[in-house]
A protein has these predicted regions:
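Hydrophobic ligand-binding cavity/cleft-lining segments
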Residues: 1-38
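Hydrophobic pocket/interface hotspot
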Residues: 19, 23, 46-48, 63, ...
Length: 141
């Protein structure tokens, strides 16, 4: 069962289709300069390669849902290729909001139960908020 770990949201002055296009670009600013290799089809694997705080990384996962302009979800793992039961899940929901969009990102825990302290949850929230801010800037430009 998926357990929500953290949720963040932002309002973007762009229609959902423009938010979707910015979100699914191969070098989406949302991924902070990293490159996402996938075909965005449910069931497809992806790799996200880039640099964070001066260190290279490769993240892994599988696309779960890809409903253009509405919802994107995928599993996520940040260290080495691990079995899927170790992955987190991330869901972006895009809702029309006035002349723009509301985007809600939820990170879920899967697999082995883990307890996250307040400091860790705050770090997750900070990182996801930075990603949404980058998405906002890209979609609004």
């Amino acid at each position: 069962m998926d357990e929500p770990v953290v949720e963040v949201e932002t309002h973007i002055a762009a229609k959902p289709d423009k938010v979707w296009a910015a979100m699914t670009a191969r070098k989406s600013p949302m991924f902070m300069g990293a490159t996402m290799d996938t075909d965005w089809q449910p069931g497809s694997d992806y790799t996200l390669k880039g640099e964070w705080e001066g260190r290279g990384f490769t993240d892994y996962g599988k696309i779960e849902t890809a409903l253009a302009g509405r919802e994107l979800s995928f599993t996520h793992w940040s260290k080495t290729p691990e079995p899927p039961e170790s992955y987190n899940a991330v869901r972006y929901q895009i809702m029309p909001a006035g002349s723009g969009s509301k985007v809600t990102l939820t990170q879920f825990q899967r697999g082995k139960p883990q307890t996250f302290d307040d400091k860790t949850r705050a770090e997750f929230k900070k990182n996801w908020s930075m990603m949404l801010e980058a998405l906002k800037k890209a979609a609004e430009s």
